[in-house]
């Protein structure tokens, strides 16, 4: 049930209904193992959707502790190692092993190429690279060796599939170091929707408590089955889902590759109850289910964030899957969830807001110029002050200072509003805001309208440089099942709901959007590609 508050300005004080627990990832795994030693904790789902190996909580803890002892003989607490792999059980095991040994994991998208991977390894100061041989045609071992060449800090390149061989070198007399809940446990590189990635340093406490508050709001319990389709290199996969499962004691299916047809079959076969996915994944699941119906009646909860979740998509999910839907909002720098809808929220709240803040989380909407709190329903930058805020950007004090002000407020770079109930709405990114003839336009408002059109599957609205207006509004869209649609139809649809100045003047159809590793549309890439002539505007017939 939502918090009953009556605000007078766009500031939501931290709610104390959930206590912040001072535990590490390793301590949490030990606690859960005491409660559910023989309960299945982890199940492998391979690239074809076949069920592979499984671990009870007792086996997961034992395997993680054994590996942690071996790692403690190779690395010292605080050292950083890069993990470059798709979703595999070994990813989960090394996450807990590193946490137990006080080693900081640096996560890397398995789709990275040479320069991108080298940047992550070098900027983070990683002393080792853990990888797999290849993934989806990407020769990862070959690229990894090349990326580490000449980096003096890197001492080892280790195959994740050979983790069981490492413990052979463990000293039986060695003990694990003392790890504090405020210590760094992970460095996550920002997804790069607006440019160069920065490494957000996250603590045990921030990741664990955030995942627990998220799972609690979803009302997840030990009898749930959670399909982890989110990438483990992202806070959603290794944080929200993995740590949410471990704290509730439920079963996690770790899905190696997101294939919507495979995921639908997994829901039926394993009686999956809970799924977190970004909007593009949800669209794909709907399309797959329409083409090949299966029994998805076990599904209780969908949650989604990471990008705009269109109202029509939410309605379709609830209609087709007959389940509850929770929209949420956050970013890597906040471990990651800031706000989330409640399961009993109205369809209007779920469709048009991103919910109320999680427990122990202060949120305010602030003027960009003065940094003062705006009035209710006024547009400003969403700012957060909480346990979940990152420690800072790794080896980048300037960027850290730009992100977190002297009063501890983390500036998200997102624009939004807050109503008297503390429900937040997103209106766009500060950097995405379009200034047309001196008037501010918010892409999300336009995108939400377009996503109500039955033929639109995905959409991105960006500012295009213009000599007369400074910027004009460009709309880039993908249609359902690649069905053709004219610019005139979409223009008229917008005019039925928006003022003339908010209606796009440039319309481009795309087959596939440039995406980050966490499946967010890269608007700056779209804008650059348009200016380079990659997209041809549709005529206004």
What are these regions (language model features)?
Residues 73, 103-165, 481-483:
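Structural core segment of the AMP-binding/adenylate-forming
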């Amino acid at each position: 049930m939502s918090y009953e508050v009556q605000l007078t300005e766009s500031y939501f004080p931290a709610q104390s209904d959930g206590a912040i627990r001072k535990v590490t990832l390793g301590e949490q795994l030990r606690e859960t193992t005491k409660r559910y030693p023989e309960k299945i904790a982890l199940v492998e789902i391979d690239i074809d959707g076949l069920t592979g190996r499984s671990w009870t909580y007792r086996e997961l803890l034992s395997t993680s502790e054994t590996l942690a002892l071996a790692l403690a003989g190779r690395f010292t607490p605080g050292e950083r190692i890069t993990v470059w792999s798709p979703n595999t059980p070994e990813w989960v095991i090394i996450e807990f092993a590193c946490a137990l040994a006080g080693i900081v994991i640096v996560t890397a998208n398995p789709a990275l190429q040479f320069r991108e991977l080298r940047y992550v390894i070098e900027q983070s100061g990683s002393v080792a690279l853990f990888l797999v041989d290849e993934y989806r045609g990407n020769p990862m071992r070959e690229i990894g060796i090349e990326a580490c060449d000449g980096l003096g800090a890197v001492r080892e390149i280790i195959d994740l599939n050979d983790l069981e061989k490492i413990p052979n070198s463990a000293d039986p007399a060695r003990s694990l170091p003392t790890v504090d809940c405020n210590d760094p446990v992970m460095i996550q590189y920002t997804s790069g929707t607006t440019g160069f990635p920065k490494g957000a340093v996250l603590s045990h406490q921030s990741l664990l408590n955030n995942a627990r508050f998220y799972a609690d709001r979803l009302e997840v319990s030990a009898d749930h089955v959670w399909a982890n389709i989110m990438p483990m290199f992202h806070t959603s996969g290794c944080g929200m889902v993995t740590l949410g499962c471990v704290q509730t004691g439920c079963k996690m299916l770790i899905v190696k590759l997101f294939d919507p047809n495979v995921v639908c079959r997994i829901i039926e076969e394993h009686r999956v109850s809970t799924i977190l996915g970004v909007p593009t994944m949800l669209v794909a699941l709907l399309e797959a289910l329409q083409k090949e119906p299966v029994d998805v009646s076990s599904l209780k909860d969908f949650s989604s964030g990471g990008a705009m979740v269109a109202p029509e998509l939410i309605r379709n999910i609830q209609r087709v899957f007959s389940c509850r839907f929770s929209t949420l909002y956050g970013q890597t720098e906040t471990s990651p969830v800031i706000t989330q809808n409640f399961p009993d929220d109205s369809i209007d709240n779920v469709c048009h807001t991103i919910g109320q803040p999680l427990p122990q989380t202060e949120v305010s909407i602030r003027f960009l110029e003065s940094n003062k709190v705006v009035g209710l329903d006024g547009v400003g930058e969403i700012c957060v002050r909480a346990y979940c805020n990152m420690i800072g950007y790794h080896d980048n004090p300037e960027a850290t200072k730009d992100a977190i002000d002297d009063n501890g407020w983390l500036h998200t770079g997102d624009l939004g509003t807050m109503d008297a109930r503390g429900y937040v709405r997103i209106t766009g990114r500060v950097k995405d805001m379009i200034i047309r003839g001196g008037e501010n336009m918010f892409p999300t408002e336009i995108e939400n309208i377009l996503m109500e059109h039955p033929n639109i599957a995905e959409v991105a609205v960006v500012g295009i440089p213009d000599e007369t207006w400074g910027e004009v509004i460009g709309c880039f869209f993908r249609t359902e099942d690649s069905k053709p649609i004219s610019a005139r139809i979409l223009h008229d649809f917008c005019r039925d709901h928006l003022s003339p100045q908010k209606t796009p003047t440039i319309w481009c159809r795309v087959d596939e959007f440039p995406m980050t590793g966490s499946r967010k549309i890269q608007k700056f890439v779209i804008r650059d590609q348009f200016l380079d002539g990659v997209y041809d505007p549709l005529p206004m017939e």
